[in-house]
Swiss-Prot record:
This is Ribosomal RNA small subunit methyltransferase G. The gene is rsmG. It comes from the Bacteria. It catalyses: guanosine(527) in 16S rRNA + S-adenosyl-L-methionine = N(7)-methylguanosine(527) in 16S rRNA + S-adenosyl-L-homocysteine. The lineage of its organism: Bacteria, Pseudomonadati, Pseudomonadota, Gammaproteobacteria, Alteromonadales. Belongs to the methyltransferase superfamily. RNA methyltransferase RsmG family.
Length: 206
């Protein structure tokens, strides 16, 4: 049932996934549903809702990530990082969260799905020092743009990007950006079967 739902949703996008990738996404939803009962990882309880509100909502970002190394800050149960790692197997994602239960779940998902391109890390973002040069910092429902820039500025250099997944276009947040950061691009995202606005906001160091 989940497989059929995913196939139907994908048909409404330009995203092409292999059968293996689709199976990995379905298995991820199954694992999230199972672990959620004990660990309370997401307020979305039904797997059919997760497929739209979590999987597709994250997946539509994949075509807009040209780099090879990203960090997903405040990843929670792996959103968008796990989904993007499945869709982009040649891109590496550090999945950062401060809560041990979330990181334990991510380690289980990594092992269960054979995701060699993810590195779950338990740490506060302010204390984390990347071991490789990162192309971008990803955040979804993590913080305001100003907080994201303040907390994550040490993770990238001038060639890196701040990439925020937002709902309604955050015009007020953009007006209060700190000096040294510039707004580069906004991308309106279409999420199948989701009746809500979604925007990708891309910032860089000035």
């Amino acid at each position: 049932m989940l497989q059929q739902q995913l196939t139907t949703l994908l048909a409404q996008t330009n995203i092409a996934l292999t059968e293996k990738q689709q199976q990995q996404l379905v298995r991820y939803v199954e694992l999230l549903t199972k672990w959620n009962k004990a660990y309370n990882l997401t307020s979305v309880r039904l797997p059919e809702e997760m497929m739209v509100k979590h999987i597709m909502d994250s997946l539509v970002v994949a075509p807009h990530l040209p780099g090879h190394h990203y960090i997903d800050v405040g990843t929670g149960p792996g959103l968008p990082g796990i989904v993007l790692a499945i869709a982009l197997p040649n891109t590496h994602f550090v999945l950062l969260d401060s809560l041990g239960k979330r990181v334990r779940f991510l380690m289980h998902v990594k092992h269960e799905l054979g995701l060699d391109n993810v590195t779950p890390v338990q740490s506060r973002v302010e204390e984390y020092q990347p071991s490789v040069k990162l192309d971008g910092v990803l955040s979804r429902a993590f913080a305001s743009l100003q907080d994201m820039v303040d907390w994550c500025g040490h993770l990238i250099d001038h060639s890196g990007k701040f990439i925020a997944l937002k709902g309604v276009f955050p015009s007020e947040e953009l007006e209060s950006l700190p000096t040294g950061v510039k707004f580069e691009q906004k991308i309106a995202l279409e999420v199948p079967n989701l009746d809500a606005q979604r925007h990708l906001i891309i910032l860089s160091k000035d």
